[in-house]
Amino acid sequence: MRVLHFFKTYLPDSFTGVERVIHEIAESTATLGVSTDVLSLSPRPAASPLTIGTHRSHQSKQDLYVASTGLSRTVFADFRRLAAQADIVHYHFPWPMMDLVHSLANPGKPTLVTYHSDVVKQQGLLRLYRPLMGHFLSSVDAIVATSPNYVQSSAVLAQYRDKVSVIPIGITDVPPADRGLVDRLRARVGSRFLLFVGALRYYKGLPFLLEAARSTGLPLVIAGAGDASGIAEAKLGNVTVLGEVSDAEKLALLKLCTGFVFPSHLRSEAFGVALLEAARAGKPMISCEIGTGTSYVNLDGVTGITIPPADPAALAEAMTTLWTDPARSEAMGIAARRRYETLFTGKAMGTAYAALYEKLVAAGRGRR
């Protein structure tokens, strides 16, 4: 079976949240007989397809980038060509250009969309986009949400309950962190600290985290790409900023840390792959209750602590709890690892998607 994934960005240009999910799906379904192509946009597209692991990355020329939306003239032809070779087309929402391409370059194949997030930030443009979005979601054969929490809280998904299913995001297990790297980072940041890892974006709740760090005085390490000027301006001696780190460095930091803090306060944080990585590492977590998958990964009182969003006092209290109660923190970390093994492995996600692909392709044959 051949599957075409379609999203606005992908490797080698970008490899953050959704791109990592696409990569995991492609690699985890490869062992189940699925051949994968990924089409995305790039300001500097590669002249020929790139091999990424077991799958192929294709790039169309990005002509404009407006309101977090890449636009392209050539992607229509590229999409038609690749869709013609595929058995099924797998979209990743939200991206308005994708909806337009689907509508104008009808793939004529079974289609599904992984619904990663509501449109949260661009509320003004949402009024203009809503008709196209409605047409797109009505016309695809299946919609996949990444957590039952998001299905329950999304007003958009409520309109399509008859074709919505849940496949949680999963990640592959990894070998233990490199000992030499662990030692080098220990020399730099210490062996006991709370950790935040993630892109430094508007919805990550970093101002509240800094306020909590100020009030508690607890050592905090922040690692991630983005504008760190606000962190620097806070001038907190107990906060260490590392900038973007490699996957190997991330594993080492997770090995060292006492607990993982993930204070995202807006629904733009639809799941939180970084939380999965912390659970995989067996670390207790702190996250906010925002009606999304973050509270599906992190169960309050079981794998960690959930708090109200944008509440630095509650965040400070949760951080202090993890810091001052090692026995409870360890128990939560063990439970987090167990929950990862039960629900959130890459194999589990790949198996579920492969089964859905087979179901949709079989249904498509039945309609012919």
Outline where the language-model segments fall:
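Conserved donor-binding/catalytic core segment of Leloir-type glycosyltransferases
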Residues: L4, V182-G217, V221
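N-terminal strand-loop element at the rim of the active site
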Residues: F6-T16, R20-G70, G226
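Short His-centered aromatic/hydrophobic patch
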Residues: Y91-M98
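A short, active-site helix/loop in glycosyltransferases that binds the activated sugar's phosphate group
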Residues: S138-V166, I171-P176
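Acidic donor-binding loop of glycosyltransferase active sites
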Residues: L194, K255-A270, K283
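Nucleotide-activated donor-binding/catalytic signature segment of Leloir-type glycosyltransferases, i.e.
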Residues: G230-L251
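Short hydrophobic beta-strand element within catalytic cores of glycosyltransferases
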Residues: R280, P284-C288
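Conserved acidic donor-binding segment of nucleotide-sugar-dependent glycosyltransferases
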Residues: L299-P312, M319-P326
